[in-house]
């Protein structure tokens, strides 16, 4: 190929012996650089995995779900559905109308209480959880905004602008809705309540708060990954570190189910 999807035999104006000149010309426009190559001052992200203990009720629900296809009134169909319910129980059993507090929600509340002046972005893959979290924040008079798929573009821009201008310190975002086209470099911390492939979407979400100018490079850049200890939540983190795909994570979960049934 010599450019624009054409081969030598297809390219009408190809001049024999001019391949090198053409390639040099194209290289001026096709060079891809990583941001780190262009902005060498980019700060390092400090990542912390926060392992939280499962509640007694969470343990019960997860054990039942691994040993059969249901827990309480929740009946699953297939491995993927089982994995989704498993992840939701780890995040907040209330999503499924199950009785149990959410250790992850409590950790977030404690973080905000202890760091009231820290601009923070909270990411979740589950819109149902975001709605539950917003209800909790309203009840506790915590100022925030939330960006999910149904938020109109103009409203989304308004939320971003207000956060960047410091009108509030908490912004909740659906991971897939906020993985790109958002500049939120006022934030000093990111909290991931739950993680799932693709790893590229997670990395894009992480980049939302990276300093965009050199004068902001020294601000904190801390990423907290909330994980339920002694659960498949921990396995997901490890698999993501190995850049595993969604299919590979699902297959790994299937294997864990097979082991638990032996």
Show the residue positions of the predicted features.
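Conserved nucleotide-binding/hydrolysis micro-motifs of P-loop NTPases
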Residues: 56-58, 127-129, 152, 177-179, ...
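Short beta-strand segments
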Residues: 51-53, 87, 119-126, 146-149, ...
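Conserved phosphate-coordination/catalytic loops
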Residues: 77, 98-106, 124, 150-157
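Inter-lobe coupling linker of SF2 helicases/translocases
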Residues: 1-103, 110, 114-118, 223, ...
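Conserved helicase ATPase core of P-loop NTP-dependent helicases/translocases
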Residues: 121-123, 131-132, 138-178
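A conserved SF2-helicase RecA2
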Residues: 197-203, 210-262
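SF2 helicase motor core recognition
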Residues: 130-134, 156-157, 171-220
């Amino acid at each position: 190929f010599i450019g624009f999807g054409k081969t030598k035999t297809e390219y009408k104006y190809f001049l024999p012996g001019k391949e090198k000149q053409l390639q040099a010309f194209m290289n001026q426009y096709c060079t891809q650089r990583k941001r780190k190559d262009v902005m060498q001052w980019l700060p390092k992200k400090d990542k912390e995995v926060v392992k939280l203990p499962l509640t007694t009720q969470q343990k019960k629900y997860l054990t039942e779900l691994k040993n059969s296809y249901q827990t309480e009134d929740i009946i699953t169909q297939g491995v993927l559905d089982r994995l989704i319910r498993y992840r939701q129980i780890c995040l907040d059993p209330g999503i499924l109308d199950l009785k149990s507090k959410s250790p992850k929600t409590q950790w977030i509340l404690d973080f905000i209480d202890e760091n009231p002046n820290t601009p923070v972005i909270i990411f979740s893959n589950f819109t149902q959880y975001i709605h539950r979290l917003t209800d909790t924040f309203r009840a506790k008079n915590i100022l925030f905004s939330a960006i999910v798929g149904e938020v109109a573009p103009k409203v989304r821009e308004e939320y971003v602008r207000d956060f960047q201008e410091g009108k509030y310190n908490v912004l909740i975002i659906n991971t897939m809705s906020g993985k790109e086209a958002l500049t939120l470099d006022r934030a000093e911390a990111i909290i991931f309540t739950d993680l799932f492939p693709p790893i590229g979407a997670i990395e894009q979400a992480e980049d939302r708060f990276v300093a965009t100018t050199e004068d902001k490079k020294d601000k904190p850049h801390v990423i907290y990954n909330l994980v339920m200890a002694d659960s498949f939540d921990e396995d997901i983190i490890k698999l993501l570190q190995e850049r595993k795909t969604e299919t590979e994570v699902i297959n790994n979960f299937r294997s864990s189910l097979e082991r638990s049934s032996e």
